Amino acid sequence: MKSLSYKRIYKSQEYLATLGTIEYRSLFGSYSLTVDDTVFAMVSDGELYLRACEQSAQYCVKHPPVWLTYKKCGRSVTLNYYRVDESLWRNQLKLVRLSKYSLDAALKEKSTRNTRERLKDLPNMSFHLEAILGEVGIKDVRALRILGAKMCWLRLRQQNSLVTEKILFMLEGAIDRKST
């Protein structure tokens, strides 16, 4: 299977060269294809899968997709990548257009993700505190500010009685952007 995957990678690099320099690396037991460190496609078991996006939805409706899946802890996980069938390989213009849609959507998502402010980026916040806030429904800075430190602390306290007043002060400092 590995040699089939490499053949498909090289064929993809050749067909999609107009998108830029396509690099590959191992990921989830498959290979990710990237342009400028942005993943837009995967190769698994000798098949190319493109990242599904809004622009490719019409194609996916007309051609019911086979989704990329992999095993994680004994469970099947379906990724948002659809298989490129032989008819699409025969229509290189359409393949390049759909690949460009996938790449553009991935680049757009990457830029919005990089501009979005995470809770852990605030003063006094750690990855652990961000995680437990997420467990009580507070997933971003906006929600933290709207609810306020006291309400967030009460939600945390309701779920875990070991949450101390120190966390309340940390939340206050994070909202006010001051270290405690």
Question: What is the predicted role of each segment?
Answer:
Residues Q13-L16, S99, W153:
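A generic alpha-helix structural signal
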